[in-house]
């Protein structure tokens, strides 16, 4: 199965994106979710270093805690930054990923996140926001 065939993509309407962003901001501000940032990814081994999560975070936020910077930047996303919603068909029980694009220092940054809000009374572990991509485009 190639990469494209295992993904289902769609564009959400403005109301859905606004609702998603409101819930994302609430989750971040409440402190009830963890931020899991994929700083090192296998796909980055084949990429120009400039387009990796590690490089982008170090370049944009050199003197900041990465998690705190991500919390702030995710909270600042707007409906205008939204690109698409993606479902990885290999993992049907995982929530959809949202893709955003935002400009920093005159360069586009590709942001892909997945929010998993787990009910801890039924599942071991905490709710989390997985930041899969935060890199120059």
Indicate where each model-derived feature is located.
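Enriched for short, Lys/Arg-rich terminal
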Residues: 108-109, 115-137
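Compact soluble domain cores
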Residues: 2-15, 19-94
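Basic/aromatic recognition patch in beta-strand/loop cores that engages polyanionic ligands
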Residues: 90-117
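A generic structural signal for short, non-catalytic loop/turn and secondary-structure boundary residues
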Residues: 72, 93, 104, 124-127
């Amino acid at each position: 199965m190639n990469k494209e065939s295992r993904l289902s993509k769609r564009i959400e309407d403005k109301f859905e994106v606004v609702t998603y962003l409101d819930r994302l901001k609430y989750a971040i501000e409440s402190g009830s979710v963890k931020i899991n940032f994929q700083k090192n990814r296998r796909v980055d081994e084949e990429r120009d270093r400039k387009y990796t999560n590690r490089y982008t975070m170090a370049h944009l936020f050199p003197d900041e805690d990465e998690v705190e910077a991500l919390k702030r930047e995710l909270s600042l996303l707007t409906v205008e930054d939204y690109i698409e919603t993606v479902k990885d068909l290999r993992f049907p029980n995982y929530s959809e990923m949202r893709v955003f694009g935002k400009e920093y220092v005159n360069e586009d940054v590709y942001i892909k996140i997945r929010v998993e809000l787990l009910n801890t009374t039924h599942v071991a572990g905490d709710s989390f926001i997985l930041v899969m991509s935060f890199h120059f485009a």
